[in-house]
Regions:
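Beta-strand cores of modular interaction/reader domains in eukaryotic scaffold and signaling proteins
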Residues: 4, 23-26, 53-56, 76-80, ...
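A short beta-strand-turn-helix
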Residues: 4-22, 63
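Thiol-based oxidoreductase modules, predominantly thioredoxin-like and allied folds used
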Residues: 5-6, 27, 39-64, 71
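Acidic, Ser/Thr-rich intrinsically disordered and amphipathic helical segments
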Residues: 10, 37, 41, 118-121
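Alpha-helical recognition domains of nuclear gene-regulatory proteins
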Residues: 14, 41-48, 65-68, 110, ...
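Aromatic-flanked redox-active Cys/Sec active sites in thiol-based oxidoreductases
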Residues: 26-32
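The canonical Cys-X-X-Cys-His
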Residues: 32-35, 77
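Non-catalytic, surface beta->alpha helical segment in thiol-disulfide oxidoreductase systems
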Residues: 73, 79-127
């Protein structure tokens, strides 16, 4: 099941309730075509991976929450464990990635776009 989050208090409570389990948060909007196309798949994943906590934040309903999570595009998927954003790369991979990009890489723990395959791969990798 996908939990709808409306504000920072709900967000923090949700992360705390997840404990050590993976949390996947989708930031989306009702008017966004790619968001509409990925949502049924995202919902199905929430039923398939019951040991993962899934949430949705509508950026139009909760702009302050989206801003505090530094969301710049939609859909954006952010992943958390133990109340922290998950880093998807090892430390050495981050250093190499940052070096190659001229140290302009800031967000390596999330991705944007309606790529269901990529989303599922990351969930499996982090479970």
């Amino acid at each position: 099941m996908v939990q709808i989050l409306r504000d920072m208090d709900e967000f923090k409570t949700f992360l705390k309730a997840a404990g050590h389990k993976l949390v996947v948060v989708e930031f989306s909007a009702k008017w966004c075509g790619p968001c509409q196309s990925i949502y049924p798949i995202y919902h199905a994943m929430s039923l398939q991976y019951q040991n993962v906590f899934f949430a949705n934040v509508d950026v139009d309903v909760s702009p302050a929450l989206a801003e505090s999570c530094n969301v710049k595009a939609i859909p954006t998927f952010q992943m958390f464990k133990k109340n922290q954003k998950v880093t998807l790369f090892s430390r050495i991979e981050r250093i190499i990635c940052c070096y190659r990009s001229g140290f302009k890489v800031k967000q390596i723990y999330e991705f944007c776009g309606a790529d269901a395959k990529k989303l599922e791969e990351k969930i499996k990798q982090l479970m």
